[in-house]
Amino acid sequence: MYPVDLHMHTVASTHAYSTLSDYIAQAKRKGIKLFSITDHGPDMADAPHHWHFINMRIWPRIVDGVGILRGIEANIKNTEGEIDCFGQMYDSLDLIIAGFHEPVFAPHDKATNTQAMIATIASGNVHIISHPGNPKYPIDIMAVAEAAAKHQVALEINNSSFIHSRKGSEDNCRAVAAAVRDAGGWIALGSDSHTAYTLGEFDEALKIIEAVDFPEDRILNVSPARMLGFLESRGMTPIAEFAEL
């Protein structure tokens, strides 16, 4: 098990069922040292108001030895790469994930989906693209991987895509992992937990990256230091409290 999980949802996204405290408790039990809460961006029907993300600045950085990153899973809105993260939200957030979600950006043809994803990557506003292997949104995988490597954006292998949602993602995700490997980019693993009990569960995602011999030194979840170093390379001010992780 890797000690970092970068994608999960709380009751603030009302189709999820756990609180921040629930995740902290599970992290302690499972040996997770750092995680990011990434509730859905405000353009989703059941997402929190944008004030929710602004006020994440009041969260403690560490609770009982577990580090907490303040994140969002924003929605890619259009082919210009616009996402539903704006204004003061950026000041409070450490980690910005963005991806396609049908209520906000309906599936299009391969060229349109690719244009939207690459524009989002090139915007400089996003750290990770969530579930890029979703078969409902065909993309030019190599073009996306090369853009992601160029702009220091990680592509996610989402464990939930093989269990609960986005059925048929396996082949695309293997292709994503292989393309990122060849482009020299970063992979992020995400449990995409909607209940704290699945925090840190990457078993199916690990099968994907192992199948393509993906190098461990390009996986963000290997340690808190690696993930924090990645964020700092993207401009995040070092967070003093995390030095003890």
Curated annotation (Swiss-Prot):
Name the InterPro entries on file.
Phosphatase_YcdX_put (IPR023710), PHP_dom (IPR004013), PHP_phosphatase (IPR050243), Pol/His_phosphatase_N (IPR003141), Pol/histidinol_Pase-like (IPR016195)
Chain sites annotated for binding Zn(2+) 2: H15, H40, H194
Q: Does the keyword NADP apply?
A: no
Matching Gene3D superfamilies: Metal-dependent hydrolases
What keywords is this UniProt entry annotated with?
Hydrolase, Metal-binding, Zinc
Which sequence ranges are marked TM in the entry? none
Q: Which SUPFAM superfamilies match?
A: PHP domain-like
The answer on whether this UniProt entry bears the keyword Metal-binding reads yes
Tell me its cofactors: Zn(2+)
| A GO term from the CC aspect | cytosol
Co-factor binding details: Binds 3 Zn(2+) ions per subunit.
Q: What is its EC number?
A: 3.1.3.-
Task: Name the positions where Zn(2+) 1 binds.
Answer: H7, H9, E73, D192
Residue ranges of coiled coil: none
* Gene Ontology molecular functions: phosphatase activity; zinc ion binding
**Cross-referenced HAMAP family:** YcdX_phosphat
Q: How does it assemble?
A: Homotrimer.
Family under the similarity heading: Belongs to the PHP family.
Q: What is this protein called?
A: Probable phosphatase YcdX
Species of origin reads Escherichia fergusonii (strain ATCC 35469 / DSM 13698 / CCUG 18766 / IAM 14443 / JCM 21226 / LMG 7866 / NBRC 102419 / NCTC 12128 / CDC 0568-73)
